[in-house]
Amino acid sequence: MKIFKKVFLFILMITISFLNIVKSTEIDENNNNNNNNNSTSSSEKIIKGKEDEEELKNAFSSSVIPPTDHNSELRRKKVIASTITLFAFIILVLIVSIVVRHVLKKKKRTKNNFIFLDDQSLNDCNIELNVSSEYFCDENKLLTTHE
């Protein structure tokens, strides 16, 4: 169980760091767009300001903000694809760990549970050997059952 917790925490740390990387690329993209807007002249800024207001109104009226250029759309698709891949990998690791844990538990249950009694133990318990029956001894003696 400790190994399962460690694997889960490791996957969680990877996911958080990945999401931080995605967030930082979005911030960098926004900064690049702002730098491009700042390089225009003052008359262009006024015209751009009116256009930006219209774009903002349109953007808020719809649920999805359209990308500004082809590169940002491509970058967004790459981020979405890598996020889906990461979560698919996490789900795969969780499934494999659950299956391995189940197999190990099953292996423990099916281990040889029989105690082989020597002649002295058999005489002490007064047991008749019969494959289909259960054999019991006193509390201080050995105990074995056929399952």
Swiss-Prot record:
It is a single-pass type I membrane protein. Residues 100-147 are cytoplasmic. The keyword Transmembrane helix applies. It is found in: Membrane. This is Putative uncharacterized transmembrane protein DDB_G0283807. Glycans are attached at residues 37-38. The keyword Lipoprotein does not apply. It comes from Dictyostelium discoideum. GO terms for cellular component: membrane. Keywords: Glycoprotein, Membrane, Signal, Transmembrane, Transmembrane helix. The lineage of its organism: Eukaryota, Amoebozoa, Evosea, Eumycetozoa, Dictyostelia. Residues 1-24 form the signal peptide. It comes from the Eukaryota. The chain crosses the membrane at residues 79-99. Residues 25-78 are extracellular.
